[in-house]
Amino acid sequence: MNRDSFYPAIACFPLLLMLAGCAPMHETRQALSQQTPAAQVDTALPTALKNGWPDSQWWLEYHDNQLTSLINNALQNAPDMQVAEQRIQLAEAQAKAVATQDGPQIDFSADMERQKMSAEGLMGPFALNDPAAGTTGPWYTNGTFGLTAGWHLDIWGKNRAEVTARLGTVKARAAEREQTRQLLAGSVARLYWEWQTQAALNTVLQQIEKEQNTIIATDRQLYQNGITSSVDGVETDINASKTRQQLNDVAGKMKIIEARLNALTNHQTKSLKLKPVALPKVASQLPDELGYSLLARRADLQAAHWYVESSLSTIDAAKAAFYPDINLMAFLQQDALHLSDLFRHSAQQMGVTAGLTLPIFDSGRLNANLDIAKAESNLSIASYNKAVVEAVNDVARAASQVQTLAEKNQHQAQIERDALRVVGLAQARFNAGIIAGSRVSEARIPALRERANGLLLQGQWLDASIRLTGALGGGYKR
């Protein structure tokens, strides 16, 4: 080997020794794979599905100002939304804190120290008062001020990976806020339409009670005239008492719903003063296929996906910790034993330092941190895969229930039409003078009972359709 090639080899030897001396990274179990990663799914809907798909503000489709106002109040004032917002701000602040570690830092410092030197210590000569020797002891007033700078070189990408992990957490928290928003809106809408269903049922029950009172009045008149016995009107009295009990139950349910709406909307007044409105008509506009290709529109799956991405970046940061850390430091200062000399040019001092930290033996600490990062990542992936399967099942169950209730409502509508025809025939016979007016009331009561059953089915369909909207992501777009 000639001299020209010998010196470069000697110069590279410390670098090779540094890399070879790093703590060894052991093999770990294989990472889990994501089931339909949400980031790879297009959120744009096929043209055939756009008309029947929920919008991000799907509740506006009901064209109900009361409902819109309740949901807006919930989104603005609900504690759950405030918690979600603060979680985002915390994640953003943590991401900024990690990002600042990747740049240079410059500090200014100044200090002054008054001290007496010991004549018997290491600095004993400075305790003497000998101007010729440059000592004016034993008292000195030392002063220092200047700039110090430092820069941690992120050669292996450790800080960049940590920043990416934090940003993934920020995106996950934002998706969680949207999920909270959709859950709140869905809860308010379901309670609101349940209240409207009970209000409509209350109206029908009052009509039934009115018809029953008509029959009771007729039976009493017949009994007073000696035409019927006292036993003939007992069944009608019992039915009227049951109707009154149902009215009391409905009133109690409405009060409970109002209390729950007050809690969700953080309403401070005693009463919401809701006004009854007609229930929306039953309709079915479901997409033909509800599969994995549409799951990216669910905020909870987006949040789970970003937690997975964050965990993968955490693994990269844990791997980068096995390699050397390189730090650059510099200072430019004024330093003097006496304050009178502090601002002289001769009191200036400066320097540059390059530091290297090489992990060689760490008792397995770095490998343990890497194992933890990989285990947490696998847990995030497993949780994501579980959420995907549950999301598909949620959509399938909700869609099936909506379709079943839509069919039940159609059958119930036919039953109500048949019952109304019976009422029409009784009314015609009454108009012809064939039967008494109480017989018309007797014909109306079964029809009103069927109307009550229809309202309950209609309310169940509304509740199921709102739950399906939530299962479909509520129109969320990342």
UniProtKB/Swiss-Prot annotation:
<protein>
    <recommendedName>
        <fullName>Putative multidrug resistance outer membrane protein MdtQ</fullName>
    </recommendedName>
</protein>
<keyword id="KW-0732">Signal</keyword>
<keyword id="KW-0046">Antibiotic resistance</keyword>
<keyword id="KW-0998">Cell outer membrane</keyword>
<dbReference type="InterPro" id="IPR003423">
    <property type="entry name" value="OMP_efflux"/>
</dbReference>
<dbReference type="InterPro" id="IPR050737">
    <property type="entry name" value="OMF"/>
</dbReference>
<comment type="function">
    <text>Could be involved in resistance to puromycin, acriflavine and tetraphenylarsonium chloride.</text>
</comment>
<feature type="lipid moiety-binding region" description="S-diacylglycerol cysteine">
    <location>
        <position position="22"/>
    </location>
</feature>
<dbReference type="GO" id="GO:0046677">
    <property type="term" value="P:response to antibiotic"/>
</dbReference>
<keyword id="KW-0449">Lipoprotein</keyword>
<dbReference type="Pfam" id="PF02321">
    <property type="entry name" value="OEP"/>
</dbReference>
<dbReference type="GO" id="GO:0015562">
    <property type="term" value="F:efflux transmembrane transporter activity"/>
</dbReference>
<feature type="signal peptide">
    <location>
        <begin position="1"/>
        <end position="21"/>
    </location>
</feature>
<keyword id="KW-0472">Membrane</keyword>
<dbReference type="InterPro" id="IPR010131">
    <property type="entry name" value="RND_efflux_OM_lipoprot_NodT"/>
</dbReference>
<feature type="lipid moiety-binding region" description="N-palmitoyl cysteine">
    <location>
        <position position="22"/>
    </location>
</feature>
<keyword id="KW-0812">Transmembrane</keyword>
<comment type="similarity">
    <text>Belongs to the outer membrane factor (OMF) (TC 1.B.17) family.</text>
</comment>
<dbReference type="GO" id="GO:0009279">
    <property type="term" value="C:cell outer membrane"/>
</dbReference>
<keyword id="KW-1134">Transmembrane beta strand</keyword>
<keyword id="KW-0564">Palmitate</keyword>
